[in-house]
A protein has these predicted regions:
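ATP/NTP phosphate-donor binding region
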Residues: 1-62
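Glycine-rich beta-strand-to-loop/alpha-helix junction loops that act as flexible
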Residues: 9, 65-67, 89-91
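Short glycine-/acidic-enriched loop or helix-start segments at secondary-structure transitions
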Residues: 16, 73-75, 98-100
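Short helix-capping segments at alpha-helix termini
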Residues: 28-32, 79-84
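Catalytic core of DAGKc-family lipid kinases
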Residues: 40, 80-193
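Short alpha-helical
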Residues: 44-45, 69, 140
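A glycine-rich beta-strand to alpha-helix segment
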Residues: 60-65, 69-70
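Short Gly/Thr/Asp-enriched flexible loops that form oxyanion-binding sites at enzyme active sites
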Residues: 70-82
Length: 193
């Protein structure tokens, strides 16, 4: 099995590439694994990379090194490929996906020794207009807050939480809150505002 670290260099408040390279090298050395590191270059690149690799049919474990966006992109790239598995190394701003594993999970995911031979558990995916979501699909104000948090993330004055709170404030104070939406769930259509 190949172990590929997909690193989003834009994730988080600090450059964590060296930390990931060190983890990958340790796995290669300590366990004689086939390990490779790849950097993403733009939005959607992780999806394209992982899909192309998964399409070869070779067994592969991807390490999503970034935040929730990187995790989401890799999930979209490997969806439908039983030869591909994913775990994550949380170096993003929010890392909300990890909250599904308990409040004390993050340190476990920051140590690749815990991840390289872990059990693979299938996840149901949420299909949202042809794009998959893992455990949550946000709409309206919540989605706008998540999208604009990155505008504040570049500020050296704000932490990850500070960026989130700034985004909440701006979206509640300066943007319209209500929007019309339509959801299809198990062939039932629901429309509302």
């Amino acid at each position: 099995m190949k172990h590929i670290f997909i690193i989003n260099p834009a994730a988080g408040k600090k450059d964590s590439r060296q930390r990931v390279y060190t983890m990958a090298e340790a796995l290669k050395k300590n366990h004689n694994l086939d390990v490779e590191c790849m950097l993403t270059k733009s939005r959607g690149h992780a999806t394209a990379l992982t899909r192309a690799i998964a399409e070869t049919g070779d067994y592969v474990r991807f390490y999503a090194c970034g935040g929730d966006g990187t995790v989401n992109e890799i999930a979209n790239g490997i969806a439908g490929f039983p030869n591909a598995a994913m775990t994550c190394i949380p170096i993003g701003t929010g890392n909300d996906f990890l909250k599904n594993f308990g409040k004390d999970a993050e340190p476990l995911f920051l140590d690749a020794e815990n991840l390289w031979n872990g059990d693979v558990t299938p996840l149901d995916l949420i299909d949202c207009n042809g794009k998959y979501c893992l455990t949550i699909a946000c709409t309206g104000i919540d989605a706008r807050i998540a999208e604009s948090v990155h505008e504040f993330g570049a500020s050296p004055m704000l932490s990850g939480r500070g960026s989130y709170l700034a985004s909440v404030a701006v979206n509640f104070l300066f943007h319209k809150i209500g929007r019309r939406w339509r959801v299809t769930l198990d062939d039932e259509v629901i429309e509302d505002t």
